[in-house]
Regions:
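Anionic-ligand binding patches
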Residues: 2-4, 10-199
């Protein structure tokens, strides 16, 4: 089966396509995404932003489309950066700038529990059908570790692996990640509707 994905983040797209290959699902990027004026993400929750994007971009897709909103919630910062994760250090902030600001705001605080959250919204012809949420718990390190991943991955320590998400390969991370969990929920939903699970 084929489903379209609306994301301009190459790291996210790689993860979604990797999962799709394993499950024999063709995850296609929405053609011409860069030329489409992006909607303003004014939601206060991941669910609101994912739904807003999915409903909007599905109007440009020839079939079912999903969009996600993902971020990091740090307990000691009251859940920040949350829905502002990608622009924590300002509009068009780099991963490095966001990571540096996060470490600065946490300082030496010993309470470093955090979670990655991903909400995927499925839509077709401008209508949101359902949302799917995935979370993974961890802690924020005092410095970045590992060359892999993207975003806050090098700062996110995952106890069962004994390392940061920046130190594990893509398939291993996706097995336990927030995005992997949310995408599997989406695929299970599609199968429950009786849609074919193969191309």
């Amino acid at each position: 089966m084929k489903i379209y994905c609306a994301t301009g983040n190459p790291g996210k797209l790689r993860e979604f396509q990797l999962a799709g290959e394993v499950l024999d699902i063709d995850v296609e990027p929405l053609a011409g995404l860069k030329e489409i004026t992006a909607p303003e993400e004014h939601g206060s929750t991941f669910e609101e932003n994912a739904s807003l994007k999915a409903a909007y971009y599905s109007g440009f897709a020839p079939g079912p489309l999903f969009a996600d909103d993902s971020g990091l919630e740090v307990d000691a910062l009251g859940g920040a950066p949350g829905v502002y994760s990608a622009r924590y250090a300002g509009p068009n902030a780099t991963d490095q700038a966001n990571n540096e600001l996060l470490l600065q705001r946490l300082g030496d605080n010993p309470h470093r529990t955090a979670r990655f959250v991903c909400v995927i919204a499925l839509a077709e012809a401008g209508q949101v059908k359902k949302t799917f949420r995935g979370e993974v718990e961890g802690e924020i390190l005092h410095s970045a570790r590992g060359p892999g991943g993207f975003g806050y991955d090098p700062l996110f320590y995952y106890l069962p692996f004994g390392c940061s998400f920046g130190e594990v390969d893509g398939p291993k991370k996706f097995d336990v990640s927030h995005r992997g969990k949310a995408l599997r929920e989406l695929l299970n939903y599609l199968r429950a509707l009786g849609l074919p699970a193969s191309r």
